[in-house]
Design a protein with these regions (language model features):
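Beta-propeller domains
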Residues: 1-375
């Protein structure tokens, strides 16, 4: 279940903390400090020797405080750990989180005062493991999804758990506070384990896991009464959401997602065919299709130079890397976030082909060079 425990070679996602570019893995491996220009590896990041375990990808930096909020998980009780690192890269808070057993969380959400942790009914079949020693992960639709809301610096017993309809969630869009309520938007999977298509032959099982249903969804949790509200916002198949990072943990309206066609719409795997700007309150959207045989990547938001959180939420640019499979040439497309459906305002031809897909991150040039100086 866990990458570090199984000694797996891993592909990596990324994160920034204390001016350092960190290479992270969702199956919980060691965080590695790498050079942002050369990608040279400097070694594991240990927060001055205080980090004694692995770190999952999708740890989050609160830009208002500079704090890194993280979690990790494993095969042994209590199965999850939650923590906070300071803007200086110091481990300032860490608590165990009790789960019913080994789980496969992928992301977390945060607000100015709380962190939202995930416990999904997606875990290994214990009967198969005991009989054959094989780790077969299954979706258990009779088990509720749980979201644990903990004060940012709360103890283990401060977690409040909320039960919701069974599902899986790869990526949170954003979370915020509204009085006694915590609101979380994300791209929900009603059933994360798809049936193989015989037409795919020997690759059927692998392709099935890359052909998933994602739906824009909203959860609301009342910290005072324990009430839960949840509803579908829109069913267009999109994922890999990105928001204006200045709005992380604050009330937001827009998310920039990738359209991934379903099998009945001609989709065969996780290929990003269009960029979609959603209004998350209404489910309305505008869309830009990349074109036949052209596939994109996750599209980070770059705030306009000098923009502040008080400015318009879509005051900035959205960027994506595309590859044309007929020529194997790649470009960086730059969109005005306020007029996405009008198409890119600039195209930058890249000197070599890039693999399409996830994940990407926007980092200001001055932050890149600051990170280099700290290497």
């Amino acid at each position: 279940v866990i990458g570090a425990a199984l000694n797996l070679r891993t592909t990596k996602s990324d994160g920034m903390c204390n001016g350092k570019l960190l290479s992270l893995w969702y199956n919980a491996g060691e965080p590695y400090h790498i050079d942002p220009l050369t990608l040279d590896t400097y070694g594991p990041e240990t927060f001055d020797g205080h980090l004694k375990h692995t770190l999952s990808a999708h740890s989050k930096v609160d830009l208002n405080t500079g704090e890194l909020l993280f979690f990790t998980y494993g095969n042994k009780a209590p199965y999850m750990t939650y923590g906070v690192a300071s803007p200086l890269g110091e481990l300032v808070h860490e608590v165990p989180i009790d789960l019913p057993g080994p789980r496969l969380p992928h992301d977390l959400g945060f607000t100015p005062n709380y962190t939202i942790l995930h416990d999904f009914p997606v875990f290994q079949d214990e009967a198969v493991f005991k009989q054959a020693g094989k780790r077969i992960v299954r979706f258990h639709p009779d088990v509720p999804t749980r979201y644990g809301i903990i004060p940012r610096f709360g103890d283990s017993d401060a977690v409040t758990w909320f039960e919701c309809d069974p599902c899986y969630l790869l990526h949170v869009i954003n979370c915020w506070e509204e009085g006694d309520w915590i609101v979380m938007d994300g791209c929900r999977q009603p059933d994360p384990v798809n049936k193989p298509d015989a037409a795919d032959g020997d690759l059927a099982s692998m392709l099935a896991q890359r052909r998933r249903v994602f739906q824009l969804y909203r959860w609301q949790f009342n910290l005072k009464t324990g009430e839960v509200r949840e509803h579908l916002v829109d069913d267009l198949n999109t994922e890999f959401p990105m928001i204006n990072p200045l709005y992380g943990g604050r009330r937001s309206q827009f998310t920039y997602n990738q359209y991934i066609p379903l099998l009945e719409d001609g989709g065969r795997t996780l290929k990003f065919e269009a960029l979609v700007k959603y209004h998350t309150d209404t489910g309305t959207y505008e869309r830009w299709d990349y074109g036949p045989g052209i596939y994109g990547s996750e599209a980070p938001f770059a705030p306009r130079l000098g923009a502040a959180a008080a400015d318009a939420e879509d005051d900035g640019y959205v960027l994506t890397m595309t590859t044309d499979v007929s020529t194997w040439r790649s470009e960086c497309l730059i969109f005005d976030a306020g007029a996405l459906s009008q198409g890119p305002i600039a195209r930058v031809k890249l000197p070599q082909r890039l693999p399409t897909g996830f994940h990407t991150r926007w980092v200001r040039g001055e932050d890149i060079y600051q990170a280099c100086q700290g290497c």
